[in-house]
UniProtKB/Swiss-Prot annotation:
UniProt entry tagged with the keyword Kinase: yes
Pfam families named among the record's database cross-references: AA_kinase
Entry keyword Kinase: yes
Name the UniProt record assigns to this protein: Uridylate kinase
Lineage: Bacteria, Pseudomonadati, Pseudomonadota, Betaproteobacteria, Burkholderiales
Pathway: Pyrimidine metabolism; CTP biosynthesis via de novo pathway; UDP from UMP (UMPK route): step 1/1
Gene name linked to the record: pyrH
Similarity remark: Belongs to the UMP kinase family.
Compartments it resides in: Cytoplasm
Described function: Catalyzes the reversible phosphorylation of UMP to UDP.
InterPro entries xrefs: AceGlu_kinase-like_sf, Asp/Glu/Uridylate_kinase, Uridylate_kinase, Uridylate_kinase_bac
GO molecular function terms listed in the Swiss-Prot or TrEMBL record: ATP binding; UMP kinase activity
Amino acid sequence: MPAYKRILLKLSGEALMGDDAFGINRATIVRMVEEIAEVTRMGVQVAVVIGGGNIFRGVAGGSVGMDRATADYMGMLATVMNALALGDTMDKAGLVARVMSAIGIERVVEPYVRPKALQYLEEGKVVVFAAGTGNPFFTTDTAAALRGAEIGAEIVLKATKVDGVYSADPKKDPEATRYTSITFDEVIGKNLEVMDATAFALCRDQKLPIKIFSIFKLGALRRVVMGEDEGTLVHV
């Protein structure tokens, strides 16, 4: 029996690269979609927010002399490319995917309309949210927090390269331990990197829990959805 009825899954663009240095690794995206399909078959409603770092990062663009807002818009377009790839892979895997963009590109993807997104979720379709919040200066983490709150998700699942939040960097400190659960205030007090401050504050204010887990661990998404000890739960 799943622990959640409706989830918001945040995938980083980098996660789609697999072992590649750039772009979308086919085997990686297929495996991720298989994990998502497994969860939807359990009756869980799934919405996804996808990043764009495998193609372009607005923050990086801003640091090399490009106007930050322009760089961020480029980053948003990168997320649309990822969302289309994800939606296409989902369709091929037998899922019904709907890509919705926060910026209008009507000939390519439909615009984000909240009641429509909710309807799709109720119908068992997977909704992929593209183009972040549609505004520059906001990360896709913030988009995940925002969309999670808007659709009434019970939890935001942040899929990363590490399998949770640690007391220190596990690569540098062999004594570092993984937290099973931690409060929002403890994360701030210990100065731990979970997600960017805006996204984090939004989740805290909305009492929307966050689960940090590794997307590269086979079956991790299913275990998280089943409420098993996987990753780190950040709660009020």
